[in-house]
Design a protein with these regions (language model features):
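N-terminal positively charged helical leader segments and presequences
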Residues: 1-93
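Short acidic-hydrophobic, aromatic-tinged amphipathic segments that line or gate anion-handling sites
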Residues: 11, 55-59, 156-167, 224
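Structured adenosyl-cofactor binding patch, chiefly the S-adenosyl-L-methionine
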Residues: 18, 124, 144-149, 213-253
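RNA substrate-binding interface of SAM-dependent RNA methyltransferases
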Residues: 19, 26, 33, 93-185
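Short, acidic/turn-prone active-site loops that include or flank metal/cofactor-
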Residues: 36, 61, 135-137, 208-209, ...
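Short beta->alpha connector loops at strand-helix junctions that form conserved
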Residues: 59, 107, 133-134, 162, ...
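Short, hinge-like loop/turn segments at secondary-structure boundaries
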Residues: 73-76, 147-151, 194-198
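Active-site/ligand-binding-proximal alpha/beta "capping" segment
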Residues: 177-232, 236
Length: 253
């Protein structure tokens, strides 16, 4: 990749690119596709042609693999500017508090695929705001995160906090802080009793191996677990995130 394109991100995967083309075609600077995708993305090609942006039918899958660094391109690769994740501000938290918003907080989730899966679940259940930790252990947006999100990236807004601990301190008094912890006493089934229908809340999801940091855990107003049969200790964080998104959405129905 030359210097001109170093700050681009390759969005690949059929559903991810389809949602990007439908919701934010203006973000696409270049588009590459296999022959079997030409008819499906005809409108996008017309859009790009009108704006004198590059689109091209590739001759082999290897070209797409080289562009996105993955064999899982599903016949399409759209290049966009590297997304800017805005820093969280107190005014965002205050707005969520006044509007009774449900938010997710990712505390050092290290796997980009898990981040993408969490974003997909959030979009599915109508949770539009996700805060990620700015620490090195936190996964960032990658082609695989976009692909695994299956188009969900176009329906959420990401924010970055210095750490989960820093965010939870700022959120005190504005959002009910609920930590996902497999050692907690209370069950996810209690969320309707914990969160009011119009109450603003943040669900804290922790690192795949270590969970929520001890400092962040101490700042949670309540810790909640997903009870199982005991055969394994816990669910994958993306699976757990899906259940928590569902529980929070159910409260608001």
């Amino acid at each position: 990749m030359n210097e001109l394109h170093q700050k681009e991100l390759a969005v690949c995967g059929f559903e991810a690119v389809k949602a990007l083309a439908a919701q934010h075609p203006e973000k696409i600077s270049r588009f590459f596709f296999a022959g079997n995708r030409a008819r499906i993305f005809g409108d996008l090609c017309k859009y790009l042609a009108q704006r004198k942006r590059l689109y091209r039918l590739v001759q082999s899958d290897s070209e797409l693999e080289k562009l996105c660094g993955s064999i899982h391109h599903q016949g399409v690769v759209a290049m966009i500017d590297m997304p800017h994740i805005q820093d969280i501000q107190l005014q965002h938290i205050q707005k969520w508090g006044s509007e009774g918003t449900g938010v997710l907080l990712c505390d050092r989730i290290g796997n980009a695929n898990n981040l993408g899966a969490i974003i997909r679940s959030a979009a599915f259940f109508g949770i539009k705001d996700i805060v990620i930790s700015g620490e090195d252990a936190q996964a960032q947006l990658t082609p695989s995160a976009y692909r695994i999100a299956q188009g969900g990236m176009e329906f959420i807004t990401l924010y970055k906090a210095p750490s989960a601990e820093a965010f939870l301190k700022e959120a005190s008094g504005y959002l009910l802080r609920i930590g996902a912890d497999h050692r907690a006493y209370r069950s996810i089934a209690a969320i309707p009793a914990i969160v009011g229908k119009d109450e603003a809340a943040v669900i804290v999801l922790g690192n795949e191996e270590h969970g929520i940091t001890p400092a962040a855990k101490k700042l949670c107003d309540v810790l909640v677990k997903i009870p199982g049969c005991g055969a394994v200790e816990s669910l994958n964080v993306a699976q757990a995130g899906t259940l928590f998104c569902s529980a929070l959405a159910e409260v608001r129905r």
